[in-house]
């Protein structure tokens, strides 16, 4: 477990404004008088661009090599970067402009903010299709057992989606 913690701490050092690193969970162990033969570390990396993926991979490789050598342990890496970064490109900026104007016309303040989150939209954007996320209902505490939605936001968000789709249909393209 302590070796997994060493890996977690070293991986966290890769954090930067362009790379989010979350050593989220260490599993393993048992009675406190037994040295476990296995520990599993789960880490989430969220890169802002493809260059950060390469930097993260290099940091992972260097961390694994350093901790394995220093502590005489075997470390295996599983998984990878399965959601490419989703930067705001020209198409996404045009789409956001349509959404923002639709919001203004409905009396809604629509603002863009980078959350660093990932979703299926990352895969769609990687195919060159413009994506704007989180147009759904308002709420909070996302991804927790306290997650909630504000019921009054259902009609406003339906109207926002409908007006956005109408405007795109009227233009015939983005």
What function would you assign to each model-found segment?
Residues 1-174:
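Metal-dependent amide/peptide-bond hydrolase catalytic core
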């Amino acid at each position: 477990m302590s070796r997994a913690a060493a890996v977690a701490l070293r991986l966290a050092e890769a954090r930067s404004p362009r790379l989010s690193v979350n050593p989220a969970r260490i599993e393993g162990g048992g009675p406190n008088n037994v040295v476990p033969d296995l520990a599993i570390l789960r880490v989430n990396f969220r890169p802002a661009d493809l260059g950060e993926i390469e930097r993260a991979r290099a940091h992972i490789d260097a961390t694994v090599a350093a901790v394995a050598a220093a502590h005489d342990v075997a470390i295996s890496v599983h998984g990878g970067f399965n959601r490419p970064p989703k930067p705001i490109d020209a198409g996404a900026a045009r789409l956001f402009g349509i959404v923002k104007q639709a919001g203004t016309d409905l009396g809604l303040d629509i603002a863009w903010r980078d959350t660093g989150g990932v979703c299926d939209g990352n895969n769609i954007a990687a195919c060159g299709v413009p994506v704007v996320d989180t147009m759904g209902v308002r709420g909070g505490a996302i991804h927790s057992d306290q997650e909630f939605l504000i019921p009054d936001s259902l009609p406003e968000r339906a109207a926002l989606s409908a007006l956005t789709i109408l405007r795109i249909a009227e233009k015939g393209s983005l």
